[in-house]
């Protein structure tokens, strides 16, 4: 009797996370959880408590996902952040391998003071999709889509950039609005921007929202410029990959140790200007949920037994931008079920 050996089926290949349309909603659930948790501390004046609440909730939500995730942009270096540190593994470990950039509470001061534009943010990409760098400052400049390539350049003066932008938009420099973080380090930038004739929108915190505002058509912001965190720069780049725009960033190192860490991470040119596609490349997904009201998202609305959240989720592969309004019934679920 002739026998045949039945071949075992080949193991299923890991599918990219963005190929699953349901994953967009899963990403939103991560930011919703963080926003809901820290919203209870909005306006209470305790930045650390609000940030920790967001971190705890986001970590729990990430660990519920069917991914093999690695935090590459997080709460800081491993020796300085107990949770969601750079290099931490998150997710069930079963599923697609993804790199994760996150900020559980973008705008901790904003949240503590009850200001505008605080939000929870997460971005995901294929392995190697995000710039891998130490947690340092980054000088940034960004504009929206539909403009000539190279309309702004980080190596040029703010006056030169404004003149080129005004010409591209067929308007006067006086018609332009520049978003800048209100910091002492920006006194010269603010003075030169006003000297050039442009108007300024100063923000207390939250430069992810500031960069995105420069890329959205109805925010009234034409340009973002200034120095903020490197993590926020990568997160903003992830959003711009979906909604379109131009952005450049240069890492700023203050100490020899920061330079040494950068070299250990594979950065050889410490003065390099990174283009948008070098900050966030490949297929990228970005999600954010408002904690307080802002130019892009509404803040959490709490009511007896529940809350309403307002989120945005974007995919660079399709360019699709979805706004998600969710009503959460706390009588039927726990924080982990968000």
Q: Can you annotate each of these PLM segments?
A:
Residues 30, 34, 116-118, 231-235:
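Catalytic-loop motifs flanking and including active-site residues across diverse enzymes
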Residues 125-153:
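Flexible glycine-/small-residue-enriched beta->alpha junction loops
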Residues 2-101, 163, 167, 208-209, ...:
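N-terminal subdomain of lithium-sensitive/metallo-dependent phosphomonoesterases centered on the IMPase/IPPase/PAP
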Residues 21-24, 45, 109, 148-150, ...:
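A short glycine/serine-rich beta->alpha loop
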Residues 155-315, 325, 330:
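An extended, acidic
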Residues 90-91, 120-123, 220-224:
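Short basic, glycine-rich beta-strand/loop surfaces that mediate nucleic-acid
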Residues 95-106, 110-131:
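DPxDG-like acidic metal-binding loop motif
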Residues 71-75, 100-102, 111-113, 132-133, ...:
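General beta-strand structural signal in soluble alpha/beta enzymes
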């Amino acid at each position: 009797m002739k026998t045949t050996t039945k071949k075992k089926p080949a193991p299923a290949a890991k599918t990219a996370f963005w190929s699953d349309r349901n994953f967009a909603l899963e990403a939103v659930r991560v930011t919703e959880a963080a926003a809901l948790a820290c919203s209870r501390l909005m306006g209470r004046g305790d930045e650390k408590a609000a940030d920790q609440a967001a971190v705890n909730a986001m970590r729990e939500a990430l660990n519920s996902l069917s991914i093999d995730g690695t935090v590459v942009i997080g709460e800081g270096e491993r020796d300085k952040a107990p949770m969601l540190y750079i290099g931490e593994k998150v997710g069930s470990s079963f599923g697609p391998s993804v790199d994760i950039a996150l900020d559980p509470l973008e705008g901790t001061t904003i949240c503590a003071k009850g200001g505008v534009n605080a939000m929870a943010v997460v971005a995901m990409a294929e392995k190697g999709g995000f710039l891998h760098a130490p947690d340092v400052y980054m000088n940034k400049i960004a504009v929206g889509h539909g403009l000539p390539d190279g309309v702004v350049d980080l190596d040029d003066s703010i006056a030169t950039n404004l003149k080129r932008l005004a010409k591209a938009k067929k308007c006067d420099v006086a018609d332009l609005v520049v978003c800048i973080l209100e910091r002492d380090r920006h006194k010269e930038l603010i003075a030169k921007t006003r000297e050039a004739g442009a108007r300024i929108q100063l923000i207390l915190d939250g430069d992810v929202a500031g960069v995105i505002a420069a890329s959205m058509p109805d925010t009234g912001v034409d340009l973002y410029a200034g120095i903020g965190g490197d993590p926020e720069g990568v997160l903003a780049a992830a959003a711009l990959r979906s909604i379109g725009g131009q952005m450049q960033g240069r890492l700023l190192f203050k100490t020899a140790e920061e330079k040494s860490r950068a070299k250990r991470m594979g950065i050889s040119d410490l003065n390099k200007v990174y283009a948008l596609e070098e900050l966030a490349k490949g297929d990228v997904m970005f999600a954010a949920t408002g904690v307080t009201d802002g130019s892009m998202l509404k803040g959490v609305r709490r009511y007896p037994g529940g809350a309403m959240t307002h989120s945005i989720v974007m995919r660079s592969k399709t360019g699709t931008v979805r706004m998600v309004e969710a009503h959460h019934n706390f009588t039927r679920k726990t924080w982990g079920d968000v």
